[in-house]
């Protein structure tokens, strides 16, 4: 069982321990990359698995989540794939693999 809206940042983490086996971290909910990384570390320390997801966004919005996804058990960063047109340059997806953002997208 994975907490999604029940765990937005570290303030919500204590109520999830014992109720869930995992949390879904989204940068939009956490307030940015710094809190998302801190939440992931705290969740691991509490024995919870990590999923990193995203809202509908361009590649620029998903690029920092690529960092938070390192070490996550599940990753769902398909937001740019749901757009009719993404920005250029865009994150490259091939056969289910997401490649690191190009430096021109997110230094």
Residue ranges and their predicted role:
Residues 10-12, 31-42, 61:
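Active-site-adjacent beta->alpha loops and helix N-cap segments on the catalytic face
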Residues 16-18, 38-40, 66-67, 90-91:
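Short, glycine/charged-enriched secondary-structure capping and boundary segments
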């Amino acid at each position: 069982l994975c907490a999604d809206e029940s765990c937005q940042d570290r303030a919500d983490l204590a109520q999830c321990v014992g109720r869930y086996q995992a949390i879904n971290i989204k940068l939009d909910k956490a307030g940015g990359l710094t809190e998302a990384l801190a939440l992931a570390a705290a969740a691991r320390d509490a024995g919870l698995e990590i999923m990193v997801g995203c809202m509908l966004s361009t590649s620029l919005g998903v690029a920092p989540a690529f960092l938070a996804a390192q070490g996550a058990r599940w990753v769902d960063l398909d937001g740019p794939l749901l757009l009719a047109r993404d920005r250029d340059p865009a994150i490259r997806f091939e056969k289910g693999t997401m490649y690191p953002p190009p430096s021109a997208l997110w230094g």
